[in-house]
Amino acid sequence: MSCPKRLLSSSLPLLITSKYRTGYEGVTLRRLDTMLRQCNAHGYFIGLNCHVCNEEGKFIMSDREMSGIGRLMAGVLRHFPEKFNLEMDINGWINIGSMTDSFKEQRHYYHWLRPWHFKAICECDDKGRFQIEGDMIRATYAHSIEIELDHPTDDIPEALYWPCNPEEIETYLELGLKPSEKQNYVHLSKTIRNAMEAGHVHINRPAIIEIDTTRSIADGHVIYRAGTTVFLTEAVLPSYIDVMPSDDPVIQEIVSEWEEEEAAKEEE
């Protein structure tokens, strides 16, 4: 008996148990780590069992497939829709059906892709990177192409956070925050932890700048709610920023977690 090529090629490493979930007798193939599944009662989820009712649910895609499609979605919706011959409107929206067809045409290993697969990825993305309205989809932040944002501007926290290299703090205190060359907006984080995690991608021990959003908004500057933890603004003046002390309890807790992870890796 042979199993479907897509499952075998995209679901390694595999745990062999007693019954393959789609009806093949003899084996069950499951990822040892994460996968995207669907519970009939509670919708899409990541993991082996529904977080609400603990039912196994229906297999949708492996973590490798989810990661690969997610990266492709981010690239197309943020940076290069023209490479996939897709039309984007002024607010960043692209037709889901057209994107499905284009992905299948240009990436043949996604021949199984359907529009609802994009919905599954969007609903399980804890960063809120994507938004679906009807039959349209867009990225919520990190665009390098020019679009006109129509994100909500209400319910902005009193303070937001931004990570930076500790050696560059004085520059930001003097000049404020401006978008990078690859982005159209300054991307601010909802919490210190969010900012630390964002900064840790490129900086070993990022410093954290706190932004007084109450004063900024009162002075007429617009801040948008984009992803789940991401907020956007065109710039932040020096008068609205301050540096979080390195001995802040939250920062110290996160650094301790990183140090434990690093020590564990060295022991492997």
Annotated model-derived regions:
Residues 2-268:
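Eukaryotic, polar/proline-rich low-complexity intrinsically disordered regions
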